[in-house]
Amino acid sequence: MGVGTSLVLRPSVPMGHVTGAPYVVALAVARELGGRVRWPHEVVTASGESLVSVDARAGYDEGVFVRCDLVWEDEKGLDAAALERVAGEAVDAWADDVATGRAAAGPLAPVLSDYFDALLGMGEKVEVLRGGRVIGEGALVAVDVWGRATVRLKGGAQELEVAPEQARLRYV
């Protein structure tokens, strides 16, 4: 059975940049657990086993906020308070970077190098799924400063760029 925690973060970032928050949270949780990240923001072991699922919803109520839900299997015995702490600290540091202009290119610009270092699956074969249906097959070749994944389709002549809200990747 899954357990988890939910936290509300209020990063001082433009509304268009809040999409970066779940990536930053996943990166922080992965560091805390000695894990890796699978696109877009799933925390996994080095072998790809799921550790923590990160989901986020943004809104505006007396300022921008992001509600982040972290979910894991009960038998993992993770410390919710520790995960909340590292998530909050990472988002605060990221918001400071955004405020100083380090995210002018996009919300992930300040952390993209660290995200790539933690990312598991670059170059691996994937299926791109939309609505549960395969719409493309190829290899994950990039993630941009907006968090979009680029998949080089079979044959290598075309690339498909997808955002997390458009499609998901299944590693094959």
Annotate each predicted stretch with a short phrase.
Residues 1-172:
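Catalytic beta-strand/loop module used to bind and position nucleotide/cofactor moieties
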